[in-house]
C-alpha cells in the first residue's frame, strides 16, 4: 500500500500547502490550562476561563495580525469559545484567512526502564476526537513528542517509541481530515554543543520519516515542527548564521522534498532570537525544497502578555506588541527581516524553562 489516498487527500494537500505559504506562519495558542496558569502568574493574572478567553480574543482580534498568519493552534477549550460579542473564534480565524488547528496529544508519560525519558499519550480515542474537531472547524492538528540530550540520551528506545507514536497520530489525523503537524522536540536543556544537537536531530528526524513511511502517511499533507539546531542552554551561544547553516543542513539530510513546509518551534528562545534565526535560514542560498516558517507560542506572545498584564486599558498596547512580532516573523519567512522591530518589554529575554511541559 502506498501513501494515504482516502477522501481527504486533496484537502489535506491543499491545507498543508496553504499553511506553508511564505510570508505567513502559525501562532501556537494551545497552551494547556496549567501552562497558561504559569504565564498568568508571571503577570499577576488569575487563571480563570474568562481571562484565558480575553487573552485569546486580544490575540485573534488584533487588527492586521491575521494577514501574517496561516494557522492558529488552539487548546480544546478555545476551539469552542467566542468573542465577547458572541462570535465563535473559529469563525473569526476563518474570516481572516487563518486555518484553525487543535492540540490533540494528552501530554507525556515516563518510559519505564529509561533515565526519565518520555513518550506521548493520547492515541486511544484519537480518531473519534479528530472527527469531532473536524466537525467543529479544525483543519490541522498538533502532537508533541519530547526527547532530551544527555550522556546516554536520547536512547534508541525513546527515539523509536516517539517516532512510532507520531506516525500513528499522523495517519489517524489524515483519515479524519486533519493535517498532522509532526513535532519531535529535542529539548535545548544541557551543556551540549551544536554538533551534538545536529547529530541527535538527524537521527531523530530520520527515525520519524521512516515511521511515517511505514504508516503510509501522505507526506504532502503533513507539516514538520522541529527544534532549531542550537547549542544547549548551558553552552556558549553561536550566531544566527551558524544556527541557520546547521539547521538547514540537518533538514536537507532528513526531510523529504514532499513535505511542503517546516514550521519551527521557538523552544524557549527569546522573541527576537527566534525571529533572527528564522530570518538567517531564509537568507541562506542553498537547496530548500520546503518553505521554512514558524509555529511560535512564547516567542509570539511574551511582550504582548507583559504589555497586557490582564488590564482592559492595556489592550491596545498589547495588540501593538503582538502585531509587531507577527510582522517581524512574517518578514523572517521571506528572509527580509532587518532586525528593526520595536522591541516590547520581554522581547529579548530568554524564555527557556528547564524540562518544559506544554
Swiss-Prot record:
Pathway(s) this gene product operates in, as recorded in its UniProt entry: Carbohydrate degradation; glycolysis; D-glyceraldehyde 3-phosphate and glycerone phosphate from D-glucose: step 4/4
EC number(s) reported in the record: 4.1.2.13
CC annotations in GO: cytoplasm; cytosol
UniProt cross-references to PROSITE patterns, sorted A to Z: ALDOLASE_CLASS_I
Source superkingdom: Eukaryota
Keyword Lyase (UniProt): yes
Site (Necessary for preference for fructose 1,6-bisphosphate over fructose 1-phosphate): 358
Location in or out of the cell: Cytoplasm, Cytosol
MF annotations from Gene Ontology: fructose-bisphosphate aldolase activity
Catalytic activity field: beta-D-fructose 1,6-bisphosphate = D-glyceraldehyde 3-phosphate + dihydroxyacetone phosphate
Residues reported to bind substrate: 39, 266-268, 298
Active site: 183, 225
Signal sequence, renumbered to the chain: none
Keywords: Cytoplasm, Glycolysis, Lyase, Schiff base, Stress response
Tissue-specificity statement: Expressed in callus.
An annotated GO BP: glycolytic process
Anything else known: Plants silencing FBA1 display reduced root length.
UniProt cross-references to NCBIfam families, sorted A to Z: FrucBisAld_I
Similarity remark: Belongs to the class I fructose-bisphosphate aldolase family.
Reported function: Fructose-bisphosphate aldolase that plays a key role in glycolysis and gluconeogenesis. Involved in gibberellin-mediated root growth. May be regulated by CDPK13. Associates with vacuolar proton ATPase (V-ATPase) and may regulate the V-ATPase-mediated control of root cell elongation.
Complex formation: Homotetramer.
Protein name (Swiss-Prot/TrEMBL): Fructose-bisphosphate aldolase 1, cytoplasmic
Amino acid at each position: 500500500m502506498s501513501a494515504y489516498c482516502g477522501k481527504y487527500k486533496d484537502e489535506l494537500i491543499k491545507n498543508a500547502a496553504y499553511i506553508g505559504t511564505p510570508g505567513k506562519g502559525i501562532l501556537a495558542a494551545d497552551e494547556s490550562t496549567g501552562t497558561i496558569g504559569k504565564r498568568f502568574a508571571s503577570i499577576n493574572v488569575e487563571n480563570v476561563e474568562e481571562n484565558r478567553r480575553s487573552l485569546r480574543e486580544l490575540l485573534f482580534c488584533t487588527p492586521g495580525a491575521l494577514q501574517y498568519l496561516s494557522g492558529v493552534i488552539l487548546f480544546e477549550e478555545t476551539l469552542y469559545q467566542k468573542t465577547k460579542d458572541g462570535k465563535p473564534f473559529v469563525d473569526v480565524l476563518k474570516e481572516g484567512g487563518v486555518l484553525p488547528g487543535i492540540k490533540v496529544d494528552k501530554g507525556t508519560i515516563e518510559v519505564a526502564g529509561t533515565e526519565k525519558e518520555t513518550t506521548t499519550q493520547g492515541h486511544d480515542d484519537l480518531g473519534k476526537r479528530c472527527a469531532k474537531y473536524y466537525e467543529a472547524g479544525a483543519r490541522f492538528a498538533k502532537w508533541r513528542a519530547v526527547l532530551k540530550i544527555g550522556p546516554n540520551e536520547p536512547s534508541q528506545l525513546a527515539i523509536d517509541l516517539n517516532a512510532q507514536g507520531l506516525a500513528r497520530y499522523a495517519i489517524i489525523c489524515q483519515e479524519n481530515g486533519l493535517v498532522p503537524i509532526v513535532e519531535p522536540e529535542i529539548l535545548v536543556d544541557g551543556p551540549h554543543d551544536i554538533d551534538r544537537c545536529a547529530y541527535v536531530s538527524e537521527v531523530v528526524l530520520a527515525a520519524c520519516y521512516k515511521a511515517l513511511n511505514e504508516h503510509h502517511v501522505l507526506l504532502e499533507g503533513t507539516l514538520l515542527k522541529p527544534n532549531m539546531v542550537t547549542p544547549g542552554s548551558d553552552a556558549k551561544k553561536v550566531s544566527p548564521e551558524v544556527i541557520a547553516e546547521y539547521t538547514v543542513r540537518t533538514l536537507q539530510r532528513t526531510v523529504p522534498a514532499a513535505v511542503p513546509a517546516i514550521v519551527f518551534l521557538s523552544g524557549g528562545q527569546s522573541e527576537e532570537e527566534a525571529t533572527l534565526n528564522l530570518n538567517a535560514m531564509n537568507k541562506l542560498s542553498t537547496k530548500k525544497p520546503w518553505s521554512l516558517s514558524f509555529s511560535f507560542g512564547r516567542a509570539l506572545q511574551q511582550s504582548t502578555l507583559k504589555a497586557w498584564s490582564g488590564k482592559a486599558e492595556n489592550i491596545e498596547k498589547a495588540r501593538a506588541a503582538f502585531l509587531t512580532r507577527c510582522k517581524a516573523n512574517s518578514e523572517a519567512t521571506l528572509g527580509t527581516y532587518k532586525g528593526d522591530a520595536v522591541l516590547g518589554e520581554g522581547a529579548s529575554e530568554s524564555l527557556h524553562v528547564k524540562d518544559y511541559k506544554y
